[in-house]
């Protein structure tokens, strides 16, 4: 919000000017996160229609008001750093701000505060920072149970963090100012939104934001209604059965939530679960406020799982793809011109389908051929063949972005864990709520390999040539992503006592494959839980925090943070020389 100059017009009196210095407060509180061009809102009364209308126009108050200029040195300092560094600093500041609230006992439940006081559980500031980074990056990894540890205020704070982080803080700001106030957006804010959730075509950024954010907000409202009815009427929820909830062998599947009230028939609890689950599904964050087992109590509720997959797909497909689909559907109307879908949308959707099918087939292959009695397919607790097949489909799709689980990942084979780690490493679409190296990156690398095999010098797709700069960027993103995952696995493995609490034979035993799974889950902003996060040391949690932030920003943007703000002029060109490769 900015300094508003409100002009009250009448026939007899002169305009009365009143200034609301809201921007100074917002600047000091959030370091000018919400800063845009100064503009005036003129409210006048029409003599003919007797309606109040407003006209939003830019004005040069900043040059005239010296008192305001002295508060802008922080903003100008950030602005000189460049767009990428500005976004990075704001993300870090917001993450620390959220962590302070989550560490504040006012957000905790009474039982959780008592447990901390009696040293029954440990909750350090690193845990709060980890949870804040996981929420704002739309990951979903957590060292503690949200349902048991945080009250309604704490859960609402986490949900808002997920929503703002998923839509994008700058994107949401531009959407509000553009849609509600009709304000014009300056070049700097356009660059912020283009980097955060825009497309390669900067001219379409404002349109993409308006269409995509509106679509996601409408979807959020619709899915909230759907999930409310499901939670209210679902007969499949497994809650509060004390005898069934007890599991003497932790290696077997047990979907029951102990000491949790079933939301069936409780509209207030159903609505609260639905709002939280809708926000996390749309924004591809694997959080839940049901209990400590994600969606395991609804293992047999296929309607909940299907709508969860649809919501996760809408949020993870990306802002440019949503805009393309909207324009394509709108072009079928007779009054609208024909619209050509971009190459980015085609590559994203085709790669998503292709990778999902490959991952699904490999998962079925490895699980059905397993001879381990504790493996997923061989446990009778998972029900019929149809129930197991649907669970495989759900888990394979959620590894692409959302991270919800209806099964215990500990029961999957080592081969399946590796496949799902690769799926999380790939992620979903660029400019979306998902993470990873993104689908378009994999598509470009795959097309370059195919071009080399068939002897083509150009990388083409759908009668379009992919530039060498995009190919080099895709290879760099892939290589740096592999490097980050390897470094993350080494640090987490060397600083974590994996089986500190696993003494008895019937308890879970973790190894390197589980570490790899968690690191890929953090990098892909997936948040699929493995139950190993509480065993991580402070160094391991900080490593995952860094990986989650990089997964949200994207590797190209992270590289530019440490680069020069100005492009260097290469006046000297050297002679080419071939180098033997392979």
Each language-model region and where it sits:
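Membrane-proximal intracellular helices of multi-pass ion channels
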Residues: 1, 5, 11-18, 24-33, ...
């Amino acid at each position: 919000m900015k300094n508003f100059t409100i002009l009250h017009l009448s026939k007899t009196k002169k305009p009365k000017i009143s200034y609301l210095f809201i921007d100074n407060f917002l600047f000091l509180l959030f370091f000018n996160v919400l800063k845009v061009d100064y503009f005036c809102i003129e409210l006048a009364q029409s003599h003919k229609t007797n309606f109040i209308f407003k006209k939003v126009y830019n004005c040069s108050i900043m040059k005239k008001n010296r008192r305001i200029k002295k508060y802008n040195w922080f903003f100008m300092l950030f602005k000189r750093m460049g767009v990428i560094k500005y976004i990075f600093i704001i993300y870090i500041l917001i993450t620390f701000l959220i962590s302070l609230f989550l560490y504040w006992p006012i957000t905790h439940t009474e039982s959780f505060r008592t447990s901390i006081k009696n040293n029954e559980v440990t909750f350090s500031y690193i845990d709060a920072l980890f949870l804040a980074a996981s929420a704002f990056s739309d990951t979903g990894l957590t060292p503690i149970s949200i349902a048991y540890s945080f009250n309604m205020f704490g859960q609402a704070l986490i949900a808002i963090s997920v929503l703002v982080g998923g839509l994008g803080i700058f994107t949401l700001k531009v959407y509000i100012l553009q849609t509600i106030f009709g304000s014009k957006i300056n070049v700097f804010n356009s660059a912020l939104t283009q980097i955060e959730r825009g497309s390669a075509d900067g001219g379409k950024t404002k349109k993409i934001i308006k269409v995509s954010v509106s679509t996601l907000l409408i979807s959020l409202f619709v899915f909230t209604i759907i999930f409310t009815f499901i939670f209210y009427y679902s007969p499949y929820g497994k809650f509060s059965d004390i005898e069934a909830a007890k599991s003497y062998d932790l290696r077997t599947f047990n979907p029951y939530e102990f000491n949790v009230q079933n939301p069936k028939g409780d509209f207030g609890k159903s609505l609260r679960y639905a709002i939280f689950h809708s926000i996390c599904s749309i924004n591809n964050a694997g959080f839940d406020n049901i209990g400590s087992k994600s969606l395991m109590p609804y293992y047999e509720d296929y309607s909940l799982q299907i709508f969860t997959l649809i919501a996760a797909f809408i949020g993870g497909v990306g802002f440019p793809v949503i805009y393309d689909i909207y324009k394509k559907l709108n072009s079928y109307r007779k009054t609208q011109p024909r619209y050509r879908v971009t190459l980015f949308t085609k590559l994203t959707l085709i790669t998503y389908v292709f990778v999902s099918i490959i991952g699904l087939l490999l998962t079925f292959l490895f699980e059905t051929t397993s001879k381990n009695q504790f493996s997923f397919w061989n446990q009778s607790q998972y029900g019929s063949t149809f129930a197991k097949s649907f669970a495989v489909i759900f888990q394979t799709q959620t590894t692409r972005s959302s991270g919800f689980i209806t099964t215990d990942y500990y029961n999957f084979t080592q081969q399946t864990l590796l496949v799902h780690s690769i799926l999380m490493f790939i992620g979903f679409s660029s400019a979306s709520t998902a993470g990873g190296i993104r689908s378009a990156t994999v598509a470009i690398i795959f097309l370059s390999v195919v071009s080399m095999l068939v002897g083509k010098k150009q990388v083409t797709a759908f009668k379009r040539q992919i530039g060498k700069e995009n190919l080099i960027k895709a290879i760099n993103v892939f290589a740096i992503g592999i490097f980050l995952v390897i470094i993350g696995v080494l640090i987490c493995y060397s600083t974590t006592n994996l089986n500190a609490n696993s003494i008895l034979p019937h308890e879970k035993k973790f190894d390197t494959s589980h570490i790899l799974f968690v690191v890929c889950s953090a990098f892909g902003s997936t948040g699929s839980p493995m139950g190993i996060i509480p065993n991580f040391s402070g160094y391991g949690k900080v490593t995952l925090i860094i990986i989650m932030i990089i997964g949200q920003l994207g590797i190209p943007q992270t590289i530019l943070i440490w680069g020069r703000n100005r492009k260097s002029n290469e006046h000297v060109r050297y002679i080419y020389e071939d180098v033997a490769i392979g």
